[in-house]
């Protein structure tokens, strides 16, 4: 694998069959192309659609370094690996599991990304001043559901690329059309 650092964020859902998406989808790919170990596994929060495959991932990698699993995310933590700055941000006043999502800001000299977990508008409002004006890449909050992605948040981050992590045929029909329009 070309780099010494490999981090995985979330592990996908448990499927109705009892399998999980990590084991059925990502693991076969990683066995042929991926790393033999992870530097860090970050679990944004405990909802099944993010954590359903965590046990399989931890078992496969014999993973020791985890955040959001045994070691909860708290406050703000920043570190640098190979010239890339990582800032782990969490809303200290969060009242819901989603708003307690571990979020991650990744910055290099050339680009930046923000991975938002399932935060909603209250967490967006409390974290907004910790975020840069403009990012290159954003994983939209809560799969593009209607509640987060406030206009202030969208304008502050002004992402060049937005990814909505959602099933095409998902029961919640994410991303919501209004949210997609806000990012255009």
Where are these regions (language model features)?
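Non-globular, low-confidence helical/coil segments that flank catalytic cores
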Residues: 1-184
């Amino acid at each position: 694998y070309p780099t010494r650092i490999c981090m995985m964020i979330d592990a996908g859902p448990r499927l109705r069959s009892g399998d999980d998406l990590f084991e059925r989808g990502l693991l076969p790919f990683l066995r042929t192309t991926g790393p033999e170990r992870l530097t860090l596994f970050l679990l944004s929060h405990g909802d099944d659609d993010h954590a359903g495959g965590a046990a399989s991932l931890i078992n496969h990698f014999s993973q020791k370094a985890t955040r959001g699993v045994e070691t909860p995310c708290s406050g703000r933590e920043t570190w640098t690996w190979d010239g890339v700055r990582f800032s782990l941000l969490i809303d200290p006043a969060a009242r819901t599991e989603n708003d307690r999502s571990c979020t991650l800001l990744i910055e290099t000299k050339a680009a930046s990304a923000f991975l938002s977990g399932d935060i909603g508008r209250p967490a967006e409002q409390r974290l907004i001043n910790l975020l840069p004006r403009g990012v290159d890449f954003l994983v939209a909050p809560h799969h593009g559901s209607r509640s987060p992605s406030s206009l202030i948040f969208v304008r502050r981050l002004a992402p060049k690329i937005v990814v909505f992590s959602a099933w095409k045929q998902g029961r919640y029909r994410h991303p919501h059309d209004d949210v997609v329009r806000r990012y255009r």
